[in-house]
């Protein structure tokens, strides 16, 4: 499988490690069983017909394996893959250059596809349906459209916010797959596999501790494993024990539920500064010093999943569970007193 990376990663060393850990075949991909079982059928059928796989939309929170699965799809199809992201496709010419360079059966992977400009997105419609693109030459009275044929290809789009996709684009994906958070038991297996690849041992209790605080997310599990490896090596250990894992998690300020410093800051702000909400995302972002998109895409999905936060039309609201955990001591006493009062 030939791979072309069209975007520069922010941290090359971390990316190289992730590529080492990343499975290359469907059989090695852990979790998302129903999703992968269906994809196996679709891929096998496409290969039997000698056709390109239908276009695939992968949605879900970050770090669950959407990019990994895009590469596996290309590998299983025996195709080359070109990889880019929505923000990089800021001009129609960039997209046209990619599409005209595709060979028959190639996979074009667009990460963060919801961030493509609408004017560029429109060029995808005819490309996905009819394998052609229409380009306007010149302008004014001399303007004319030129139609370019492109080879049949598979577009794999990944998004953390499928609700931001336009209806015309979403309708053109024949396969729509959503990722769910991973159970701790599955993450333990991912951690053990990654530790073998990284060349460091890990005991069952250490793997369990890391998995339990990884927010159901393989990317976070692998990142915590690498940090635990750092602590082990600095301490002169060749093995990640439970004590090393606990030291790592404590130093990184990650609690038993996987909440980090920013998670707690968000919830404490909603509970104590905004009296539990509702609070608008713009006000919340300013209060905690974080970008709105980051809060919505990275932090909120897990806080909602964990039962601490709800979204309403008026803004973000802390749940009762959050009020009990993140309120000040006096406010917690008031909540407990209220709960203890008999009802008439």
From Swiss-Prot:
Residues 256-344 are annotated as: Head domain (RuvB-H). Residues 183-253 are annotated as: Small ATPAse domain (RuvB-S). SMART domains: AAA. It is an enzyme of class 3 (hydrolase). It comes from the Bacteria. GO terms for cellular component: cytoplasm; Holliday junction resolvase complex. Pfam families: AAA_lid_4, RuvB_C, RuvB_N. Mg(2+) binds at residue 67. Belongs to the RuvB family. The RuvA-RuvB-RuvC complex processes Holliday junction (HJ) DNA during genetic recombination and DNA repair, while the RuvA-RuvB complex plays an important role in the rescue of blocked DNA replication forks via replication fork reversal (RFR). RuvA specifically binds to HJ cruciform DNA, conferring on it an open structure. The RuvB hexamer acts as an ATP-dependent pump, pulling dsDNA into and through the RuvAB complex. RuvB forms 2 homohexamers on either side of HJ DNA bound by 1 or 2 RuvA tetramers; 4 subunits per hexamer contact DNA at a time. This is Holliday junction branch migration complex subunit RuvB. The gene is ruvB.
